[in-house]
Amino acid sequence: MLQPKRTKFRKVHKGRNRGIAAGTEVSFGTFGLKAVGRGRLTARQIEAARRAMTRAVKRQGKIWIRVFPDKPITEKPLEVRMGKGKGNVEYWVALIQPGKVMYEMDGVSEEVARHAFALAAAKLPIKTTFVTKTVM
């Protein structure tokens, strides 16, 4: 599972997922999976999508993961009264804004890439689209 090796603070405020995305262009591979909606991806969802893509391309080509879960999400145990401090860190998420390229792929044909990204998109909670690298 993806998570930071060390952080400055163990727990963070909830905050809001606003703003515009960085990393909106396909930069490493030839094909990409771009977010259309806004949301957050857990480390488990990122890994599930990666596994689906890897199986679909039969370990050919190369896959880049352009998102990293760096925000800790806390939860209180079941049947615990409110108060008594913030809960324990349960999982890590990556905040996604519209336009962010989340995955990239190279070394496979476009049909294979489209199929692999379709399988990966089914594992993700946000709407996505298939993009290709624009050559200047």
UniProtKB/Swiss-Prot annotation:
Record's keyword terms, sorted: Ribonucleoprotein, Ribosomal protein, RNA-binding, rRNA-binding, tRNA-binding
SUPFAM superfamilies from the UniProt entry: Ribosomal protein L16p/L10e
MF GO annotations: rRNA binding; structural constituent of ribosome; tRNA binding
UniProt record, GO biological process: translation
Keyword Ribonucleoprotein: yes
A GO CC term attached to the entry: cytosolic large ribosomal subunit
InterPro entries referenced in this protein's UniProt entry, alphabetically: Ribosomal_uL16 (IPR047873), Ribosomal_uL16_bact-type (IPR000114), Ribosomal_uL16_CS (IPR020798), Ribosomal_uL16_dom (IPR016180), Ribosomal_uL16_sf (IPR036920)
Disulfide bonds: none
Entry-linked PROSITE patterns: RIBOSOMAL_L16_1, RIBOSOMAL_L16_2
Record's subunit section: Part of the 50S ribosomal subunit.
Record PANTHER family: 50S/60S RIBOSOMAL PROTEIN L16, LARGE RIBOSOMAL SUBUNIT PROTEIN UL16M
Purpose: Binds 23S rRNA and is also seen to make contacts with the A and possibly P site tRNAs.
Family: Belongs to the universal ribosomal protein uL16 family.
Protein name: Large ribosomal subunit protein uL16
Organism of provenance: Histophilus somni (strain 2336) (Haemophilus somnus)
Gene: rplP
